[in-house]
Amino acid sequence: MDAMIKALSPRYPTFEIAFLRFAFGMVGAVAYWMWTRSGWPTRETTLYNGLRAVLGVLTATSFFFALSLLPLADAIALSFISPALTALMGAMILGERLDWRIAVALAAGFLGMLLIVGGKLGSAGFGTEALIGAAAVLFSALVYSLNIILLRHRATRDPLAQIILFQNVGAGLILLLPALWVWVTPTLADLVQFAILGTLGVVAHTMLAHAFARVEAAKLAPIAYVTLIWGVLFGFLFFAEVPGLATFAGAALIVVGTFITQRR
């Protein structure tokens, strides 16, 4: 998804990309909600998941904007302060246990992120655009962590279909006016990409909600670091972004951290 968004970002404004991602996601979300016959949400469900929709919009727009300014692997690497924040917030807010294996895994993943950032961003020259992009990523990581904690809180209380419905329909409605303000008419080929993007978003969010309903946030958080491996690969294949030794060293730490949690 991130690679597709980065490819679309030179041609379309951030608000439009985010809107179309959620707009196409609405189709799958509504269909899933109707198929499961989950019923109408309660007032409590509406309140919490409405807040999640707002957090989702802030996360998406800030990270999509960052992708237009930073190499793919760098943007993903910076965003991976989020798993550490998620695990810590899970312990502080939800009372989840933070044992030594998870702490070591988080530390390994965070050190891996620092290696990649220091190696790639440092060598490229940290200019104004990169600084703005990095700030946008860090903001998105903070908001995303709050969103994940709220998802963990609601995933055991609300029907999965309602969670998916709010995340897509709510975010789409919030983004409608900003997207129209900066609208650039998409080509047919790009509309197909947006449709794929929306579908992938719904599938990914469904799997994420399903996982957080069954596993503590702290244990799942380090697994997200594996995404960085794909970011490096797609950055190389589609954007000619060649990773350096620091990237591979950081990726190795990330993988080690992920396997530690699985041996818990």
Per-region residue spans from a language model:
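Loop-to-transmembrane-helix transition segments
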Residues: 33, 38-62, 131-140, 185-203
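Cytoplasmic-side transmembrane-helix entry/capping segments in multi-pass membrane proteins
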Residues: 43-55, 98-111, 130-134, 155-168, ...
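Juxtamembrane C-cap of transmembrane helices in multi-pass membrane transport proteins
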Residues: 1-12, 17, 61-72, 78, ...
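Helix-helix packing/entry segments at the starts of transmembrane helices
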Residues: 76-81, 154-170, 205-236, 263-264
